[in-house]
UniProtKB/Swiss-Prot annotation:
The record marks R342, G343 as: Cleavage. The keyword Transmembrane helix applies. It holds the Pfam family Hemagglutinin. Glycans are attached at N30, N46, N141, N167, N249, N424, N496. Residues 1-18 form the signal peptide. One of its GO terms (biological process) is virion attachment to host cell. It comes from the Viruses. Its main location: virion. This is Hemagglutinin. Residues 19-529 are extracellular. Gene3D superfamilies: 3.90.20.10, 3.90.209.20. It comes from Influenza A virus (strain A/Fowl plague virus/Rostock/8/1934 H7N1).
Length: 563
């Protein structure tokens, strides 16, 4: 008996995974959070602190002519109390005032003291010239036990004018001084307020006393006020020191009939300097340009949170203790599961999903997989483009803050010279402005950095897409599935922007036609395989039943049913 058995095999052809190249960016496991204009706590790969919080607890004076006044108060360098004898003339880049310093010996005060102090701090030192005043009919040697050298004395730069004898009349006198130099002169004089009317009569004679001072820009009359006051340094009297700035070729005239403390020499400022009030140690072995009462700030950061009264070339004081400046792209950490599973083609993901922590030599880069294996490489062109734009960001921020805040400084310095001091609440208000501006500037720069990083990523994506054209297809995750065999040299040409599209066009088109009609996602492959197996089994069963039916019909096979 001839029995023919036909066997059919159903072969389901599933296309193998194509070569693939993915675009990605650098990521770290733990980034740094910064604030932008639109969002707080944005995580970035890198960030730099812009607020300095540490300093050197010393006055760094290396390379500077430093004058440490010690017990001498700065204003005393003009009038000359005993504690200031060695500082009557000096040159300095840095003037240090100490808490123990005293401006006076005989009790009194300087009018518009703070404004005068500001002028002297920036003076660069003091040079002096005799005013040439001579007197007759009076005494010029008044002394006091409050100003002691070897015995009773007086201010070295002033003359205490007294009646020729006790209770004698003081003559009306007029003295003038013309500034013949090219620089402005600082002129200081005093008005003596006796401890009582009796004391005033003893020193200057009876009658009302009047002192008049005038120049082309200044005119003022003074009347002494004798009276009982608490004793200081054994004295109940007071001396009020007044001052003016005398322009070149201008003349100052003094008219008086007693109670006048006459200047002996005019003072001239030598240049520019910086003055600070501090009690910390001076160190000639370190350098600095920014000083405050607690030491030296040597930071190159744009802001500081150490002291609002720092002087010199300083970071601007802000209330915030930290303002982080983004110097890297937005961070999207790579999930640990993907790091563990990577190695199969399907595990490679592009920039749309997550960053790559393995990309350590660049900000942007590629991953590929082909028959030769897997590889990762940075794209230096896009990385360098981003770095070039971000490098110097800190310096640009310093320029912005210095320009803006120095302008405010200059405006208020002028006001300070006019009114004698700067109101504390005004300084506090300006600190608020600085703090707000600093936070705004940093947020703007952070926004720009993140936008810039995204822009460079998009540029790289467009560069690859334009090269591959229809030779590949983007899968929606930042990866391109290539429709032709692409070895390592081929992958390198894509990265280097030298890929020849036409060279692979024909192969890519043929593979695309085969793949497109049955393009299946990996999630459905198991279902199709089981369906194919079931269909094959059903077909074989149908053939077997058909053969049995034909054999029975032709008599070649007999079927007997027993009950």
């Amino acid at each position: 008996m001839n029995t023919q058995i036909l066997v059919f095999a159903l072969v389901a052809v599933i296309p193998t995974n194509a070569d693939k190249i993915c675009l990605g960016h650098h990521a770290v496991s733990n980034g740094t959070k910064v604030n932008t204009l639109t969002e707080r706590g944005v995580e970035v790969v890198n960030a730099t602190e812009t607020v300095e919080r540490t300093n050197i607890p010393k006055i760094c004076s290396k390379g500077k002519r430093t004058t440490d006044l010690g017990q001498c108060g700065l204003l005393g360098t003009i009038t000359g109390p005993p504690q200031c004898d060695q500082f009557l003339e000096f040159s300095a880049d840095l003037i240090i005032e100490r808490r123990e310093g005293n401006d006076v010996c005989y009790p009194g005060k300087f009018v518009n003291e703070e404004a005068l102090r500001q002028i002297l701090r920036g003076s660069g030192g003091i040079d002096k010239e005799t005013m040439g005043f001579t007197y007759s009919g009076i005494r010029t040697n008044g002394t006091t036990s409050a100003c002691r050298r070897s015995g009773s004395s007086f201010y070295a730069e002033m003359e205490w004018l007294l009646s020729n004898t006790d209770n004698a009349s003081f003559p009306q006198m007029t003295k003038s001084y013309k500034n013949t130099r090219r620089e402005s002169a600082l002129i200081v004089w005093g008005i003596h307020h006796s401890g009582s009317t009796t004391e005033q009569t003893k020193l200057y004679g009876s009658g009302n006393k009047l002192i008049t001072v005038g120049s082309s820009k200044y005119h003022q009359s003074f009347v002494p006020s004798p009276g009982t006051r608490p004793q200081i340094n054994g004295q109940s009297g007071r001396i009020d020191f007044h001052w003016l700035i005398l322009d070149p070729n201008d003349t100052v005239t003094f008219s008086f009939n007693g109670a006048f403390i006459a200047p002996n020499r005019a003072s001239f400022l030598r240049g520019k300097s910086m003055g600070i009030q501090s009690d910390v140690q001076v160190d000639a072995n370190c350098e600095g340009e920014c000083y405050h009462s607690g030491g030296t700030i040597t930071s190159r950061l744009p802001f500081q949170n150490i002291n609002s009264r720092a002087v010199g070339k300083c970071p601007r004081y802000v209330k915030q203790e930290s303002l982080l400046l983004a110097t890297g792209m937005k961070n999207v950490p790579e999930p640990s599961k993907k790091r563990e599973k990577r190695g199969l083609f399907g595990a490679i993901a592009g920039f749309i999903e997550n960053g790559w922590e393995g990309l350590v030599d660049g900000w942007y880069g590629f991953r590929h997989q082909n028959a030769q294996g897997e590889g990762t490489a940075a794209d230096y062109k896009s990385t360098q483009s981003a770095i070039d734009q971000i490098t110097g960001k800190l310096n640009r921020l310093i320029e912005k803050t210095n320009q803006q805040f120095e302008l405010i400084d200059n405006e208020f310095t002028e006001v300070e010279k006019q009114i004698g001091n700067l109101i504390n609440w005004t300084k506090d208000f300006i600190t608020e402005v600085w703090s707000y501006n600093a936070e705004l500037l940093v947020a703007m720069e952070n926004q720009h950095t993140i936008d810039l990083a995204d822009s460079e990523m998009n540029k790289l994506y467009e560069r690859v897409r334009k090269q591959l054209r229809e030779n590949a297809e983007e899968d929606g995750t930042g990866c391109f599935e290539i429709f032709h065999k692409c070895d390592d040299d081929c992958m390198a040409s894509i990265r280097n922007n030298t890929y020849d599209h036409s060279k692979y066009r024909e192969e890519a088109m043929q593979n695309r036609i085969q793949i497109d009609p049955v393009k299946l996602s990996s999630g459905y492959k198991d279902v199709i395989l089981w369906f194919s197996f079931g269909a094959s089994c059903f077909l074989l069963l149908a053939i077997a039943v058909g053969l049995v039916f034909i054999c029975v019909k032709n008599g070649n096979m007999r079927c007997t049913i027993c009950i």
